[in-house]
């Protein structure tokens, strides 16, 4: 799913996994776009999109990030009627659907980008008392890379050995 804590305005569209490694292996990164909006009954929890302008910007941001990184995204909400019953949101999703379908025919190529490389075995070598993995990996990816304004990718350490690793 879309990372729960960082899905509001000012953040990127990041899943809770290493999607770029999934795509590199020729697999589909299927990302649940659990985007909370003003239509929820949860109040101000979960960093939601608050009005029509934020809804437009946030939902298009999510599709743009997904398409540009080779992910497939699908809108999903589990909290009441939410955006399934909101006309503004449904209109945005209908327009996005056309763009999403068309994007499969667009030329795609790698572009120069920043790369975060994660050693997924490193957690075995630490004592976990200072939450280093959260600070060094999750926090930096969500608070740093997704907000820095440049293209980036997140890969596993073992990806560097692959012949098809992109020239980032």
Predicted features and spans:
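Carbohydrate-binding surfaces of carbohydrate-active enzymes
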Residues: 1-168
């Amino acid at each position: 799913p879309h990372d729960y804590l960082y899905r509001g305005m000012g953040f990127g569209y990041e899943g809770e996994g290493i999607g770029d490694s999934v795509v590199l292996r020729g697999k589909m990164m299927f990302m649940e776009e659990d985007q909370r909006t003003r239509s929820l009954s949860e109040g101000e929890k979960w960093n939601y999109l608050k009005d029509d302008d934020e809804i437009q910007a946030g939902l298009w941001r999510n599709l743009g990030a997904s398409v540009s990184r080779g992910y497939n995204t699908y809108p999903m909400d589990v909290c009441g009627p939410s955006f399934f019953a909101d006309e503004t949101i449904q209109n945005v999703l209908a327009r996005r659907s056309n763009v999403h379908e068309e994007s499969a025919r667009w030329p795609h190529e790698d572009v120069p980008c920043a790369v975060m490389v994660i050693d997924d075995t490193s957690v075995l070598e630490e004592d976990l008392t200072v939450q280093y993995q959260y600070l060094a990996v999750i926090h930096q990816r969500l608070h740093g890379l997704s907000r820095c304004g440049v293209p980036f990718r997140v890969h596993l350490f073992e990806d560097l050995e692959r012949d098809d690793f992109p020239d980032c």
